[in-house]
Curated annotation (Swiss-Prot):
Positions of the Glutaredoxin domain: 1-101
Signal peptide span: none
Organism: Arabidopsis thaliana (Mouse-ear cress)
Protein name as catalogued: Monothiol glutaredoxin-S5
Record-level GO BP terms: negative regulation of transcription by RNA polymerase II; response to nitrate
Task of the protein: May only reduce GSH-thiol disulfides, but not protein disulfides.
Subcellular location per the Swiss-Prot or TrEMBL entry: Cytoplasm; Nucleus
InterPro entries with a match to the protein in the record: GlrX-like_pln_2, Glutaredoxin, Glutaredoxin_subgr, Thioredoxin-like_sf
PANTHER family for the chain: GLUTAREDOXIN
Amino acid sequence: MENLQKMISEKSVVIFSKNSCCMSHTIKTLFLDFGVNPTIYELDEINIGREIEQALAQLGCSPTVPVVFIGGQLVGGANQVMSLHLNRSLVPMLKRAGALWL
């Protein structure tokens, strides 16, 4: 859990993902299309990927990827991110976190 806390506090937008997950790809593309430069951790490529997945599960994230943190706060998975986007709450959240300026 300590590694997870350090990872999410380093940048304004952090995405935990897996290369094999199509929803992870969709969420990463959404943020990149906004012009946001998220820190992306591919859990199937890093040594502590399983440990991070377990920590995400302990936070209640199911499925464990994709998971998005904005401003150090858990936003959730693809469903939560898309809901925020559709109700026009995502961009203001990104601006408040300093991840988006326009």
